[in-house]
Swiss-Prot record:
Residues 496-672 form the Helicase C-terminal domain. Its EC number is 3.6.4.-. It comes from Haemophilus ducreyi (strain 35000HP / ATCC 700724). Keywords: Activator, ATP-binding, DNA-binding, Helicase, Hydrolase, Nucleotide-binding, Transcription, Transcription regulation. The gene is rapA. Coiled coil: none annotated. This is RNA polymerase-associated protein RapA. SUPFAM superfamilies: P-loop containing nucleoside triphosphate hydrolases. It comes from the Bacteria. Transcription regulator that activates transcription by stimulating RNA polymerase (RNAP) recycling in case of stress conditions such as supercoiled DNA or high salt concentrations. Probably acts by releasing the RNAP, when it is trapped or immobilized on tightly supercoiled DNA. Does not activate transcription on linear DNA. Probably not involved in DNA repair. One of its GO terms (biological process) is regulation of DNA-templated transcription. SMART domains: DEXDc, HELICc. Residues 162-339 form the Helicase ATP-binding domain. The keyword DNA repair does not apply.
Length: 973
């Protein structure tokens, strides 16, 4: 019966919103849909309409914008009035149904079922699987570590896991060059973000590394950082009509920020704004530039010190922690833990005291007997343990090798836990990490063209000569001869180009990376190689967008039809690694050792399978050859990493400059010998200062190896592949198998959502193969941690997709018309993300399968086997079933609520027990270690105590809700 003013919805056109009866006669009813500004006239006998009536406990929207919590429902001659209290002010009001908001949405599965918003059965299945996978991923110990687009390097994974799971980590990451500090920092950051402990992040880097960090964070971790500079910040500077400053703090506009510490040193207003903004995590790269001694500290150090006081989590990165002296090293440790590192003299004394322990550890590692000095050093550090029986086993020739191995490992583990800086400082060295190739240097000495010599003479006569002119004569010539005719341009006579083309023809089957100083040189070189020798060439420079660089990198990476050569400007290649190539040509020699190492580091990474061949073409009697000789014979910087390179560069810069001014001056050989001797001296000091105990703690050993293997086993996981493809199919993405383990995803016009996370308008190419993704940077590597999967799961579980469905069960053993109810409940704790309770109690789906008598058959009938027997029902038939069986379905829903309580309570109790066990064990370990290791911060223990108390309290309040349901009706065929 239709009454004017009643609210109805259309079964076939849910998108019209909530309709209102405006007229009726003996044969028809007229419904107006204000939200869609549409009107429909239906025949009374077959009107596809459903009456909308809310129930006690529902929250409904008024047309005026406020909400009402329904406490009672009155029926006034077929017209409904809702009684309850307003959400905004608590006022008790009556709301006639005519005043309901025209845009209605039903979120409860039972409401959707009875309002003709029934979904397909395969979407219900996808929703349940999404909930299952979400639960599994929240509890996975590999979460936030397997999604990185990088090789699985054990020591990196170990540091990331050890630090990333801490509450408010404050550490110094000091791995040597090429061992992946940026990756370690990114994985630590990823874990902190995933756990909810961190939301706002500030990364401070030298200006030259800004783009490298931006690219690394995006390409390796799918983290969209924003680069802040003066131009960006000035957009937030505002004044009102009276000239009063009403500027906003630009650093509050983004959550993930990268800024140059060099810029902030000069821009005091911006530095103040950084300090005024709230941050959860601070990352500082190249932290050895933070100089501090007993008498003075740099401006950069003071600025970072102020930030470190107010930001709870801090990561400092440096490849050379003691490069500028132990006092600066101590000062950086004091930034991290001022209570622990309060006195420099005490710190020095402690460092000396650990020397005998480090020597003892070396003996333990080499399975050598321990002398009295070593035993005394170990016994003093492990004073709470009786170590004598262990020493006897180690020193006795009669001891079984397995016993000695076990005791040695126990001692090493105990010493690591008590090591002076092992919780604050992590350092791996190339000696301690295997897998690096050799570097082979080839110096190509060429005659300087007369054109360059003349250009240099002209510049000298003009009195405006600069060192850059000697290092990059092609730029000088181009500047002086900008209108040079064809055949007389620099690329027409430079002998480096002739050598390069011959070299490339002789190495046709090998990839070659060429690094130039400037983008213009790279572009010109590429054009010459293409036009003269048809050499397939890609270009990489700072004026290209990230997408353009991706395409160039992909072209270079292709094996069959890819580019033989990638020509890059020195800035353009920052953050990009090309381990699949082994030939490096430095067309322009970098003008300082750090830049040289950065260039070689594009190929010299963990994962490089071949020896790296480094070619440097340079001119006789030039600055270039002086610098090349000094790099090679003085620093040995081409064939070995030179961590002391910048120190030596600063120490010998004046003498080096004198030879730049006169490359043929006498005494150069003595200068080379002096540099080499000093390098050997510094290298020996570094080697003697190696802390094997620290390296052991940083390396992770067998545990780290097992972690890498566990992640490798998850790569190409069939559950992930099947779920992802099913997700993309149901969402409505077009999928094209490209072969070679590649799938192209493209948006379509019939997608369930207009904007799928991670999918660009042009489409996205994906793979589940890590090695392929490492070679092809334009391809997305899909893992459980990838945004397309994580946000795809969120899209399904937090929306209405698959919330209710109706299916036919083809089973000859059941009477036709038998009704079953499959209800999916979710047990969860509504708590602050920072508690990271999802590791103990993630949103957990619990399945209840009731027969018509109310018996729960979930344990007897598996979801997958039932799914195979189900057939879809068209929408019209589904609506009829929902109407006809409404009373029975409601009864079964009430029964399911009784069944779920016992199951849910058991899950909550188990989660509380797990949380108590894990947090108590962690607390006990830290408390015990604090007695013997001063590096355990008191605030770290206090935070953990608070975390435990709050976690258990929140888990006590955990609850459950009906997430989705499926009505199943049996049929014979």
């Amino acid at each position: 019966m239709f009454i004017i003013g009643q609210r109805w919805i259309s079964e076939s056109e849910n998108n019209l919103g909530l309709g209102i009866v405006t007229a009726r006669d003996n044969r028809t009813v007229t419904i107006r849909f204000p939200a869609a500004e549409e009107e429909r006239i239906y025949a009374l006998a077959v009107a596809p309409l459903i009456r909308v009536q809310f129930q006690k406990g529902d929250r409904i929207n008024c047309i005026d914008g406020w909400q009402l919590d329904v406490e009672d429902v009155l029926d006034n001659q077929g017209f409904v009035i809702y009684l309850g209290s307003r959400v905004d002010n608590g006022e008790q009001v009556a709301l006639p149904e005519m005043q309901l908001d025209h845009k209605v949405s039903f979120s409860k599965p039972q409401d959707r079922l009875f309002s003709a918003q029934i979904d397909r059965s395969d979407r219900f299945a996808l929703r349940y699987r999404a909930l299952q996978h979400q639960q599994a991923q929240f509890q996975s110990p590999l979460r936030a570590m397997r999604g990185i687009r990088a090789s699985l390097i054990p020591h990196q994974l170990h540091i990331a896991k050890e630090v990333g799971q801490r509450v408010a980590p404050r550490v110094l990451l000091a791995d040597e060059v090429g061992l992946g500090k940026t990756i370690e920092a990114g994985m630590i950051l990823q874990q902190q973000l995933f756990s909810g402990r961190v939301e706002r992040v500030l990364v401070l880097v030298p200006e030259s590394l800004q783009h490298q960090w931006l690219v690394e964070m995006l390409r390796r971790f799918n983290l969209n950082f924003s680069l802040f500079d003066e131009e960006r910040c000035s957009d937030f500077d505002k004044t009102d009509e009276d000239g009063n400053d009403i500027s906003e703090n630009p650093f509050e506009s983004e959550a993930l920020v990268i800024a140059s510490i060099d810029w902030l040193e000069k821009a005091t207003t911006r530095a103040t704004q950084v300090l005024l903004a709230d941050w959860d995590l601070l990352i500082v790269d190249e932290a050895h530039h933070l100089v501090c001694s007993a008498t003075e500290s740099s401006q950069a150090y003071q600025f970072v010190a102020r930030l470190a006081k107010k930001i709870t989590a801090v990561l400092l990165l440096t490849a050379t922690p003691e490069q500028l002296g132990l006092d600066s090293h101590f000062a950086r440790l004091a930034l991290l833990d001022p209570d622990r590192f309060y006195d420099y003299a005490t710190f020095i004394a402690e460092q000396k005291a650990y020397k005998p322990v480090a020597d003892a550890v070396a003996n333990l590692l080499n399975d050598k007997p321990l002398n009295d000095m070593a035993k005394n050093a170990i016994a003093e550090l492990l004073s709470e343990q009786d170590t004598e029986p262990m020493f006897k086993i180690i020193n006795s020739e009669k001891s079984a090798e397995s016993d000695r191995l076990q005791v040695r490992q126990e001692l090493i583990n105990a010493l690591i836990d008590r090591h002076g800086t092992s919780r604050v400082l992590f350092r791996n060295t190339r000696q301690g990490v295997k897998g690096f190739p050799h570097r082979v240097y080839h110096q190509i000495t060429l005659e300087m063209p007369d054109q360059y010599a003349n250009a240099l003479n002209v510049r000298a006569m003009m009195g405006s000569m600069e060192p850059q002119d000697h290092f990059y004569p092609e730029r000088l010539y181009q500047c002086l001869n900008s209108q040079a005719p064809m055949g007389n341009r620099w690329e027409d006579f430079d002998p480096r180009i002739a050598w390069l083309m011959t070299f490339l023809k002789n190495h046709r089957d090998e990839k070659v990376l060429i690094i130039c100083k400037q983008a213009e040189i790279a572009i010109t070189l590429a054009q010459v190689l293409r036009e003269r020798e048809a050499i397939r060439t890609a270009v990489f420079h700072e004026h290209m967008t990230i997408v353009e660089r991706d395409r160039a990198a992909a072209y270079f990476a292709q094996i069959e039809e890819g580019a033989q050569v990638l020509i890059s400007s020195s800035i353009g290649s920052e953050g990009r690694n090309f381990q699949f190539a082994r030939n490096l040509v430095l067309f322009n020699l970098p003008d300082n050792p750090d830049l040289l190492e950065q260039s070689i580091g594009r190929l010299d990474r963990i994962g490089q399978k071949n020896d790296i061949q480094i070619y440097v073409p340079c001119f006789k009697n030039s600055m270039q050859i002086v610098l090349a000789e000094w790099y090679h014979r003085g620093l040995n910087a081409f064939e070995e990493t030179c961590p002391m390179g910048s120190n030596l560069f600063a120490e010998f810069s004046e003498t080096l400059q004198s030879f730049f001014n006169d490359p043929q001056a006498t005494g150069f050989e003595e200068f080379i010998a002096k540099t080499s001797k000093r390098r050997q001296q510094l290298k020996m000091e570094l080697e003697q200062g190696r802390d094997r105990l620290l390296e052991l703690n940083s390396n992770g050993g067998e545990t780290a190896q097992a972690l890498a293997e566990a992640i490798a086993q998850e790569d190409n996981n069939p559950h992930l592949v099947n779920f992802a493809l099913n997700l993309f199919d149901i969402i409505g993405l077009e999928q094209e198998d490209l072969g070679e383990k590649l799938i192209a995803l493209n948006p379509t016009g019939h997608m369930l959502v207009s904007d799928f996370p991670g999918l660009s308008e042009e489409g996205t190419t994906i793979t589940f193969d890590r090695q392929l993704a490492l070679m092809r940077e334009e391809i997305e590597l899909l893992t459980w941690d990838h945004p397309m999967i994580r946000h795809g799961i969120d899209l399904i579980t937090s929306g209405d997709i698959g919330k209710c469905a109706i299916s036919l069960l083809i089973n000859k053993n059941l009477p036709a018309g038998t009704l079953l109810l499959e209800a999916i409940y979710v047990v969860e704790a509504q708590a602050p993300k920072s508690l990271n309770l999802t590791r103990f109690l993630p949103p957990t789906p619990v399945r209840v399968l009731l027969d018509s008598k109310g018996n729960d058959m979930a344990s007897q009938v598996a979801f997958t086997s039932l799914e195979k027997q189900l057939k879809p029902v068209n929408k019209q038939m589904a609506n009829k079933i929902a109407k006809m069986a409404q009373t029975q379905i409601k009864k079964l829903i009430m029964l399911s609520e009784q069944k779920i309580e016992t199951k849910a309570q058991a899950i909550i109790i188990a989660a509380k027990q797990q949380a108590d066990n894990v947090l108590s064990a962690e607390l006990h370990r830290l408390t015990s270690l604090q007695a013997v290791n001063k590096n355990i911060r008191a605030d770290e223990i206090e935070l953990l105590e608070h975390l435990k108390a709050e976690s258990l309290a929140q888990l006590t309040q955990a609850n459950w809700r009906l997430d989705s349901l499926r009505v199943i009706v049996s049929n014979k065929a």
